[in-house]
UniProtKB/Swiss-Prot annotation:
Record protein name field: Elongation factor G 1
PROSITE patterns (UniProt xref): G_TR_1, G_TR_2
Gene3D superfamilies listed in its UniProt record: 3.30.230.10, 3.30.70.240, Elongation Factor G (Translational Gtpase), domain 3, P-loop containing nucleotide triphosphate hydrolases, Translation factors
Keyword Iron-sulfur: no
Binding site for GTP: 17-24, 88-92, 142-145
A cellular-component GO term for this protein: cytoplasm
InterPro entries: EFG_II, EFG_III, EFG_III/V, EFG_IV, EFG_V, EFG_V-like, EFTu-like_2, G_TR_CS
Species, as recorded: Paraburkholderia xenovorans (strain LB400)
Pfam families: EFG_C, EFG_III, EFG_IV, GTP_EFTU, GTP_EFTU_D2
SMART domains: EFG_C (SM00838), EFG_IV (SM00889)
Record's keyword terms, sorted: Cytoplasm, Elongation factor, GTP-binding, Nucleotide-binding, Protein biosynthesis
Amino acid sequence: MPRKTPIERYRNIGISAHIDAGKTTTTERILFYTGVTHKIGEVHDGAATMDWMEQEQERGITITSAATTAFWKGMAGNYPEHRINIIDTPGHVDFTIEVERSMRVLDGACMVYDSVGGVQPQSETVWRQANKYKVPRIAFVNKMDRVGADFFRVQRQIGDRLKGVAVPIQIPVGAEEHFQGVVDLVKMKAIFWDEENQGIKFEYRDIPPELAATAKEWHDKMVEAAAEANEELLDKYLGGETLTEEEIKHGIRVRTIANEIVPMLCGSAFKNKGVQAMLDAVIDYLPSPLDVPAITGHDEHDNEIERHPNDNDPFSALAFKIMTDPFVGQLIFFRVYSGVVNSGDTVYNAIKEKKERLGRILQMHANERKEIKEVYAGDIAAAVGLKEATTGDTLCDPNHVIILEKMIFPEPVISQAVEPKTKVDQEKMGIALNRLAQEDPSFRVQTDEESGQTIISGMGELHLEILVDRMKREFGVEATVGKPQVAYRETVRNKVEDVEGKFVKQSGGRGQYGHAVITLEPAPQGKGYEFVDAIKGGVIPREYIPAVDKGIQETLKAGVLAGYPVVDVKVTLTFGSYHDVDSNENAFRMAGSMAFKEAMRKARPVLLEPMMAVEVETPEDFMGNVMGDLSSRRGLVQGMEDIAGGGGKLVRAEVPLAEMFGYSTSLRSATQGRATYTMEFKHYAETPNNVAEAVINAKHK
């Protein structure tokens, strides 16, 4: 079956927003309008529109799926049909892993901002992740009908706080309760949507006279931004010629895809205004899979290879989310980068190095799931029947293996012991935790060897709370949770040279002999562990050098201070000796381990603790309480600013995670429940001596 929609008419987009910016309503409206036009396209007597509306009102469609497919022919029906795959992204900081994961498979994004709140803390996190994966974006300023709505303030904030170049391609007609529509700066016409039929109908009118000067000013700025796309447009613009609508759109498209500008639109999803024009902007300015660079990966021999977004290249795809569905079991959502795959085909999981049969393939539409036989380059779909796949795995053609860049997930910073309340819960808990860990790579489960307890680790207190809650709701497991524990690390501050480890054993028969001399020094933060082989003249035979490295790596798991993992160290193997008969891999593994332990003791070992970026939004009256409380928690206040719309103050601080337990309770009591906060992991920093001593002593008890 040939593909219905050519790949240049695909748009894989994410809609991301701060919690209250109205993302769900915006997404619902997109599904509503695309569903309506899709249905109208099929039924020519017009009746479909109405019943679809009733059903929509009755059910209030909300995406629960990770990816939904919609079709769009333009607000005025003037485009060939485009296929828009919408990937859902959560708005909460503890789940930035989800956002990161979806950014990896998007080609473009629509950032939704609240017209009053503007750019908020989480908007910054999402923006940084979009920068990391070079995702082109458009901005939609929602809730223009709210009291305090200010489109231009949000435009300034995108510049000041996010360092983005926001170029309005619309400006609002009115604001707050007088918000009526928008001025399309490309056409230089005002658009008014008809509220009677939920904004399906609209009309272009002349720009209201009181807005003419403002519209001209922003139109000129937009044209200038578009003209900078290439020499040809720039020459025409500088020569005083007028750019056509097509040229303006082309210029904006080129610069948006190059991540140089962010086109800005506005509306009120709730009042059915503006979302339709935003969908047109998705088609006009966001890239198709052909407009973004080809995906690169490595073959089995670690050579870099490319896969192009066409159906004739070998099949390659990335699994980006796992969901457990009550009807079909486990769903693996995947993005196809190249080639075609059919249900029933065998695919190769390049990370797990296993072949698996692809069972059914499903695609989610606005309000239904549809079973499909095949998916093509650029598609996003969900597979049933893959047992081995987890998030971040590459699925590919078994005869043309590629490993796409593995997703890098943050290390958890907090852990808790969890115990089932009854014997019956014991077995169910194991199954539940494994299922949850499969879905969420930033959540880890392990067993403490000393105590035998099950330890769960994640990105924050809220993250673990929600997972324990899901265990109860979805799997019926009651569990008690221990006190949260901080994931400390150890490292060294000094360089030490010529430290030796010698493992010699003579006890009748064949002995053991391994001898290694190392230099240990601090490595840059975030580097992890680096091993350099500087052996000259064969003083240690080649085949034993990996054993020394292995011995050191095993020792890194538990440092000399308090048994925490060791990070950011560089070890150079400089010298050693061997015995013709008694030397073996095990002896050199032991020698490496002994040398490292000894070197670490001498290199001024220190304890590191996770530092969190904390942002508190509080009414001004409680400012003193909040600051005092953060300082008492060894917090460093890094800045304060007014919250837009007279909503109090935003305090930014860096606070050790160890001091943040129970913070939500004490913040509630310090501010009568009127402040809110977010926190996310920033980096590891050296723990002050008095605190480190207490941690080390507690560990040795």
